[in-house]
Amino acid sequence: RVVGQMPDNNSLARRYFGAGELKNSTHISTAELKAEYGNIPVIVRGDDGVVPMHGADVSSVVPMPIEIDDKIRAVDEDKLSRATGEGRNQIIDDYLRQHATMVRNTTNALCCQAHKGNIDYMMQTADGLTRYKVHYGNVKKLTFPKTLATATYADILKFLTQLRSECTKNGIGGPGEFVASSAVYSRFAEVVTNAKIADAIKDDHILMGSFKVYEDNDFYFDKDANGNKITKSLCDTNEIVYRALNAGQKLKYLKLDDVVQKNAVPLYQFT
């Protein structure tokens, strides 16, 4: 079935990874996840080319599927039996949209976690919930030397520049942006207002010098060790994240080997 287009996904975490790539494999190598995307040396004409540093890690990651096994509710089953052909399609489409929203929200949650270099997500097994973990990189953390409440405009600019320089030290330059928790974003807005910085507060971000700072708009649910539901975000409280926009970040959709659809697709549904 062809379901109407979903509303735009406004997740900042998901936006960072751009359009998803389809990879017709059930595995993805760790080396591919860790591949470096920096500059390479030029060579003398006629010499051998540069061998990309894909890494020697031969281990692989097996992505786990987002699988929803739903049954029509009794009240909808009654409506389904009395509905016309078009009415039946609308009931089915409502279910499919709900499932598509669940998949989107789960993808957004994984994108949030990927910003920190680790996936640590709840996974359903026959014995209950366990953790699905993937580590593919270390993220440098810096501590702001002053309290947020006393920070000046100059203090903040100095720290943002320091954060960006951590990327350039690793050979990743070019454009970048910041995502800040609500507390940090609110304080930045207060600072630029008090400093009378003209035209610094935009519709969806704040300009701190030449840096764009966005307010974290992502949240997702997880469960703690006791099984209690907790809410998480891309940024922790009083945290700001810098992300280089040309760091080679990608989102890949892999195929599953236990469903009728044998090709990699972002979403597959059947009734």
Q: PLM features: residue spans?
A:
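Short conserved micro-motifs at the rims of enzyme active sites and ligand-binding pockets
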Residues: 45, 189-191, 255
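Extended, solvent-exposed, turn-rich assembly/linker loops in the middle of proteins
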Residues: 129-202
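Acidic surface patches and DE-rich sequence motifs
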Residues: 35, 125, 222-224
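Long, contiguous amphipathic alpha-helices that act as assembly "spine/axial" helices in icosahedral shell
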Residues: 60-138, 155, 165-179
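Sequence/fold signature of self-assembling virion shell proteins
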Residues: 193-271
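Assembly/oligomerization interface modules of large self-assembling protein complexes
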Residues: 10-79
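Basic/polar low-complexity intrinsically disordered segments
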Residues: 4-39, 132-135, 231-235, 242, ...
